[in-house]
A protein has these predicted regions:
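Conserved beta-strand positions
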Residues: 1-2, 56
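Glycine-rich, proline-tolerant flexible connector loops at the mouths of alpha/beta enzymes
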Residues: 2-10, 61
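Conserved active-site-proximal phosphate/metal-binding subdomains
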Residues: 14-32, 38-180
Length: 180
């Protein structure tokens, strides 16, 4: 899996657009693209970069079958394109989440030079708080930059049908690039 920095959760520094072709060129096994993929346009783009499949986390969090707390799903649905934050850069463990009071406090403490231990105590159990308890204020609501593109909570079956349709439409729309 070649996962770009647009992803939610623990991230690296390289974007999906730059990472996927480099990984495709470096290995002889199928590459799965992840990070920043929310719809058929993103899937088609990943295929054009050489990926043979995609991994979509944030988009599938907002499905009926996903067993995260309803508050978590609703927080993703309300997100805008500028609502993710990356905490933990100074610790060497960067994490992308949706902004909330906890991320604000974390980033303030991180900027002030707080110790690793102090920062760790602030986020201890944070994912469980958000996913299980539905605490989207002090929990860690891990989400990718595509959260602002998520507008509904379909079933996985409905979402898959939509993604396949959108991917085909995107490829067909851009088929003028291929000479016959």
């Amino acid at each position: 899996v070649a996962e770009g920095t647009e992803s939610g959760g623990h991230i690296g520094e390289t974007t999906t657009m730059a990472l996927v072709p480099q990984v495709v060129d470096a290995v002889k096994i199928p590459v799965i693209a992840a990070g920043g993929i929310a719809d058929g346009r993103g899937i088609a783009a990943a295929f054009m970069l050489g990926a043979e499949a995609v991994q979509m986390g944030t988009r599938f969090v907002a499905t009926q079958e996903c067993n995260v707390h309803e508050n978590y799903k609703q927080f993703v649905l309300k997100a805008k394109d500028i609502d993710t934050r990356v905490t933990g850069r100074t610790t060497g463990h960067p994490v992308r989440t949706l902004r909330n009071p906890m991320t604000k406090e974390y980033l303030e403490k991180e900027a002030a030079g707080a110790s690793f231990e102090e920062l760790e105590m602030l986020t201890l159990g944070g994912l469980r708080k958000a996913v299980v308890d539905g605490d989207v204020k002090t929990g860690s609501v891990m989400s990718g930059q595509i959260a602002g593109m998520v507008k509904d909570v379909p079933t996985c079956k409905e979402l898959m049908a939509r993604l396949i349709r959108e991917t085909k439409e995107t490829v067909k729309k851009n088929s003028f690039l291929v000479e016959e």
